């Protein structure tokens, strides 16, 4: 009886190795598709998996073929429209499948739809936040923030061909072949000794000699059938993410909820902050987040109230900056904490309050924070708050500002603000 043993450790994901290779090969196209898909999601559905589509021509394999130009002679079967020696005009286009869908219908042409496949939540978030980091992160005395880095972690029985360990695989192959053939080799050695004795004995024992030769041949065949290398022998270099202790950090999220912020603008601000929250919680451990909502008055709130409260009012931006300054002095010593802030507003502010915002940031907040980002969400012309902040940007290296006009700008602006910097952090 023949037994088939499934040694694959992937279980239901039997093509995991091929899947990982595919994700690496077409990472650029997948990231482009993800950046387009993130803007189409609802606010509460940012961290689930995603159906990714890639143009078919991007995944086509290179091949040699004749060019489409030049003069060709071909033989086609005749029909009621063409007869011998007729010349057929070359087609002038008319592909289908990946077209825009605009224009007149045609009876000619063919094409291929885009290749669509599903990626998991983890794969989606890994690609979404790749190459992002908190800027100017400083090593402080108390260490609680944990960043995960990839390290070698021995060997594993499954992996991608690029990580295969030839030496360890051959060692396993030798051990397996030795274990599977040791008993047969001892038996073979004993039979060969008996055959030598019988062959030299008198009188000759032909039947016994023939039986021994047959058993020896069968044993040798069994030994030779043991494969030199088996999938069970293969070992791959294993890598795992290990916590890398770093400095503790706090992120202040300041959101304008005044009456000038319509629902569409608030939704874009929420999308930005949800991306920020997912990035912090997935990339770092023990990062504290302080949520501040403001109109004419500022208030520190919890996560649920920050995203879903319907409270609104007038606009005094300095109230949020004053509250942040109070919280920093009360709970977050700059010598022990890396302090970050992200402020989102439509730029509409009481005119006399904008210079006060400039003063609070310049004298109190920017000297103690590692990085302060301001996002203005509006399609109107910039007002006094933006102009005051432009002076800060030219003076302070740890201040950045970006403009969001519609949903398509959210993810590119987010990556621009938090892209990983090669330069060393300042002290």
UniProtKB/Swiss-Prot annotation:
Segments of this protein annotated with the region Disordered: 87-110
InterPro entries hit by this protein: UPF0229
Coiled coil spans: none
Record's signal peptide: none
Biased composition annotated in UniProt, kind: Gly residues: 92-102
Domain of life: Bacteria
Disulfide bond annotation, renumbered to this chain: none
Any single Pfam family the record assigns to this protein: DUF444
HAMAP family found in the cross-reference section: UPF0229
NCBIfam families linked: PRK05325.1-2, PRK05325.1-3
Protein family: Belongs to the UPF0229 family.
Name of the protein in its database record: UPF0229 protein YeaH
